[in-house]
Amino acid sequence: GKMYVMIQKRQKTVEKGRPVEKWDDYLKCWCEVKSLYGKELYTALEAKLENVMNFETRYCKALEALNTKEYRVVWGERIFKLINADYGKYDRRKVVLKGQEVV
């Protein structure tokens, strides 16, 4: 079903001489949360990727900045590290964010 998710951006700072990592809210967006199925599911399992979900959302300019290492998706109490952002097949109408749950 459709629901809000929060995309967060990793911020790295140095405090008292030590590197500190924190996550700041970047973009709240309305997504359709979809489980993997069929060929996509088997490919993920072969690559040892478990607890992977697709977050399908409407395209917006802010989503173009997503490089996968610096962003994550927060859905309720669950956190997903971003492993792919697919802008391609929907001709800039939709973006599919693929996230793996951090457990």
Where are these regions (language model features)?
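Short, conserved turn/kink motifs that form compact alpha/beta structural patches or helix kinks used as
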Residues: 19-103
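Active-site-proximal polar cores
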Residues: 1-20
